[in-house]
From Swiss-Prot:
One of its GO terms (cellular component) is ribosome. GO terms for biological process: ribosomal large subunit assembly; translation. InterPro entries: Ribosomal_bL20 (IPR005813), RIBOSOMAL_L20_CS (IPR049946), Ribosomal_protein_bL20_C (IPR035566). This is Large ribosomal subunit protein bL20. The gene is rplT.
Length: 119
């Protein structure tokens, strides 16, 4: 009986991993075992990065809103509280965009928030 080194399935699996490892330095792009470890690690980092990206963008939006709100004489937390009391449900991404691109509309929202806090 002839010796079988590895069949179609194994070859395809190894080629798939080596294709994913393309561009890695040295043995990480050439040798299957090392490449497999590098690919697994990179996929793990990619998964974690997708979660972190959401947090990072939310932090960025809050920082931008806070800066714009303080320019109008109100803190971020009081601004958000005033909007909630006024029943205005605009997400932080949109508030951030308004703070940067539409200063008049953002100023109007700040005034509404201030009125709700004083009432």
């Amino acid at each position: 009986m002839a010796r079988v080194k590895f069949g179609k399935v194994t070859r395809r699996r190894r080629k798939k991993i080596l294709k994913l490892a393309k561009g890695y330095f040295g043995a990480k792009s050439k040798l299957f075992r090392v490449a497999n470890q590098a690919v697994m690690k990179s996929l793990m980092y990619a998964y974690i990065g997708r979660k972190l990206r959401k947090r990072d963008f939310r932090k960025l939006w809050i920082t931008r809103i806070n800066a714009a709100a303080r320019a109008h004489g109100i803190s971020y937390s009081r601004f958000i509280n005033g909007l909630k009391k006024a029943g205005i449900e605009i997400n932080r991404k949109m508030l951030s965009e308004m703070a940067i691109n539409d200063e008049k509309a953002f100023a109007e929202l700040v005034n509404i928030a201030k009125q709700q806090l004083n009432a």
